[in-house]
Amino acid sequence: MTRAGLSPLAWLDEVETQRRAAGLRRSLRARPPVGTVLDLASNDYLGLSQHPRVIDGGVAALRTWGAGATGSRLVTGNTELHEQFEDALASFVGADSALVFSSGYTANLGAVVALSGPGSLLVSDAYTHASLVDACRLSRARVVVTPHNDVAAVARALATRDEERAVVVTDSVFSADGDLAPLRELHDACRRHGALMIVDEAHGLGVRGDRGRGLLDEVGLAGAPDVVMTTTLSKALGSQGGVVLGPAAVRDHLIDAARPFIFDTGLAPAAVGAAHAALQVLVEEPWRAQRVLDHATTLAQICGVADVPSSAVVSVILGEPEVALAAAMGCLERGVRVGCFRPPTVPAGTSRLRLTARASLSDDEMALAREVLTDVLSRA
């Protein structure tokens, strides 16, 4: 059969039909202006994306440095503001140094690939974020994926390896369920077997630890010489961008070896200025971290979730994709936006509503959440 005349994209129609049949078709919906819909879906955990000081920080940087970074950080994309923010964030979390990337995704890609490579072993939790999964795939290292939070499996992979170098990668707080990694136990395994540990604190920074310093701080691993922390600026800090924090030698190596850092345009100054201002607010208002957890506990009680949340994330498992999607749309029709996680983001049969608490939720907003969620979930 000749292929002449066939569209090279004809296969997309079949794929879309399959997605629709499985209830997995995704679409974009424009976010309305602030205040028109109650937001229980975003990752703006501390409510800082709309904070006046954070907005002012972004605007001031915009006026001083311009709209874009204009180049990679090794060319023209590095400013005093980037370096000041790196110093401030490193000091806050107890790290020796920090390096800002254009996103949390590229920070993970840069760190994992540059710190592993051919001839090394990567051990990854089965539930790590997609950015860590992709980093492992790009690394050209041998990759072992271990069952979720299975420290014994991690230790076995490290103990039986032939490779001299090994790296264990994990989230500190897992994004779909909001549960915590056993960081202390994982670190003990790494130390016994001479492995580096890379921890993504995207959902831990600003919520866990003393004054919101993250789960690494909470378990006494802040600044450990064999731990590298990555995080995003798009969640608790209400901006965007990513950071790798750790020993100064790691920062120096990433500047020379992390391809997303070398070849990507630097993070826009406005995003850096906003994140820096948000960090200052967090330092001055540490109550925000506990407020997030308090609101998450209330949301879990409203939804009938038995376990007390360990983070801002409240996961309400409903089973099939169409059930979760219908519940999410029912909430939106009543003025409440919630997240809807379906495969492949979560395993088949565990489609869910993913609610996120915010420190800035008012009593009236919590009352609306109770009214809408109670009604919608009673029908799900």
Curated annotation (Swiss-Prot):
Pyridoxal 5'-phosphate binds at G104, Y105, S175, D200, E201, A202, H203, T232, L233, S234, K235. Disulfide bonds: none annotated. GO terms for biological process: biotin biosynthetic process. Its EC number is 2.3.1.47. Pfam families: Aminotran_1_2 (PF00155). Pathway: Cofactor biosynthesis; biotin biosynthesis. Its cofactor is pyridoxal 5'-phosphate. Substrate binds at R26, H129, T345. InterPro entries: Aminotrans_II_pyridoxalP_BS, Aminotransferase_I/II_large, AON_synthase_class-II, PyrdxlP-dep_Trfase, PyrdxlP-dep_Trfase_major, PyrdxlP-dep_Trfase_small. Keywords: Acyltransferase, Biotin biosynthesis, Pyridoxal phosphate, Transferase. GO terms for molecular function: 8-amino-7-oxononanoate synthase activity; pyridoxal phosphate binding. It comes from the Bacteria. The modification N6-(pyridoxal phosphate)lysine is found at K235. Gene3D superfamilies: Aspartate Aminotransferase, domain 1 (3.90.1150.10), Type I PLP-dependent aspartate aminotransferase-like (Major domain) (3.40.640.10). It catalyses: 6-carboxyhexanoyl-[ACP] + L-alanine + H(+) = (8S)-8-amino-7-oxononanoate + holo-[ACP] + CO2. Homodimer. Catalyzes the decarboxylative condensation of pimeloyl-[acyl-carrier protein] and L-alanine to produce 8-amino-7-oxononanoate (AON), [acyl-carrier protein], and carbon dioxide. PANTHER family: 8-AMINO-7-OXONONANOATE SYNTHASE (PTHR13693:SF100), CLASS II AMINOTRANSFERASE/8-AMINO-7-OXONONANOATE SYNTHASE (PTHR13693). Belongs to the class-II pyridoxal-phosphate-dependent aminotransferase family. BioF subfamily. This is 8-amino-7-oxononanoate synthase. The lineage of its organism: Bacteria, Bacillati, Actinomycetota, Actinomycetes, Mycobacteriales.
